[in-house]
């Protein structure tokens, strides 16, 4: 059983600054970290490894220079995967969901898999598209919002999803792609033994050419900016007469 768990390196949000001039975001001082939602996918994959016979967990990521960081690689491997594959290329630095999914699908095909796990979204864009797009590209079943994995056999995965008024149980034929919600588990903090052992695990570094990927992105990101802050008008209306009520209503109309 070959399980791939996908993750994304994202900027640490506490270190992101906003440029006052145009509202653009400054990532220059933000260290990269594993997307919070993908930690649940990594944990779920490693829990499945304990259930499946001869299961192997491969962590897979696509991106730019952030994936060259040795500390980041060790962080991923210390959480339980047996090996790590990173696909690094400058064109993937700010890849949008469609391109990310295409690269992940190509890399997964080269690596081989029975099951692909990922988080419902990423901590930066949270587009909630990549998992389903990977399934579409590979032409295999894809399910998102999975809150519990009930069982795994050689050819079937049984899962639960929490819907608005009910709990849905699904049996999914393998191979498949599953995007898990944060309700599925609580990611463990790696032990010192796991951190030290991570340095001994294999890491494969692939380029776009290595996976036969040469498609250009269908669209590109133009700008990411923080919302403009409006100054408070500090209008105070005193009294409860008809004129004051009318003035209050008029000011409300201006801001609604």
Curated annotation (Swiss-Prot):
GO terms for molecular function: electron transfer activity. GO terms for biological process: carnitine metabolic process. Keywords: Electron transport, Transport. The keyword Electron transport applies. SUPFAM superfamilies: Adenine nucleotide alpha hydrolases-like. Pfam families: ETF. The keyword Transport applies. Transmembrane segments: none annotated. Pathway: Amine and polyamine metabolism; carnitine metabolism. PANTHER family: ELECTRON TRANSFER FLAVOPROTEIN BETA-SUBUNIT, PROTEIN FIXA. Required for anaerobic carnitine reduction. May bring reductant to CaiA. Heterodimer of FixA and FixB. HAMAP family: FixA. Belongs to the ETF beta-subunit/FixA family. This is Protein FixA. It comes from Escherichia coli O81 (strain ED1a). The gene is fixA.
């Amino acid at each position: 059983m070959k399980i791939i768990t996908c993750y994304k390196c994202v900027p640490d949000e506490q270190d992101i600054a906003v440029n006052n001039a145009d509202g653009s975001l400054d990532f220059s001082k933000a260290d990269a970290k594993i997307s919070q939602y993908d930690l649940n996918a990594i944990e779920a994959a490693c829990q499945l490894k304990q259930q499946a016979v001869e299961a192997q967990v491969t962590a897979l990521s696509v991106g730019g220079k952030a994936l060259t960081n040795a500390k980041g690689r060790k962080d991923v491997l210390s959480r339980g995967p047996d090996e790590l594959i990173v696909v690094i290329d400058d064109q993937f630095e700010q890849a949008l969901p469609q391109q990310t999914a295409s690269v992940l699908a190509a890399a997964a095909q080269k690596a081989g898999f029975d099951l692909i796990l990922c988080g419902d979204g990423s901590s930066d864009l949270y587009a909630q598209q990549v998992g389903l797009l990977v399934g579409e590209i590979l032409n295999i079943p894809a399910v998102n919002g999975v809150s519990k994995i009930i069982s795994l056999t050689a050819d079937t995965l049984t899962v639960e999803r929490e819907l608005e008024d009910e709990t849905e149980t699904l049996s999914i034929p393998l191979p498949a792609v599953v995007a898990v919600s944060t309700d599925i588990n609580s990611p463990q903090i790696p032990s010192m033994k796991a951190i030290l052992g991570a340095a001994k695990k294999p890491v494969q570094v692939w380029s776009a050419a290595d996976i036969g990927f040469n498609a250009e992105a269908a669209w590109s990101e133009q700008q990411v900016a923080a919302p403009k802050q409006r100054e408070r008008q500090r209008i105070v209306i005193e009294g409860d007469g008809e004129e004051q009520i009318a003035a209050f209503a008029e000011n409300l109309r201006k801001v609604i």
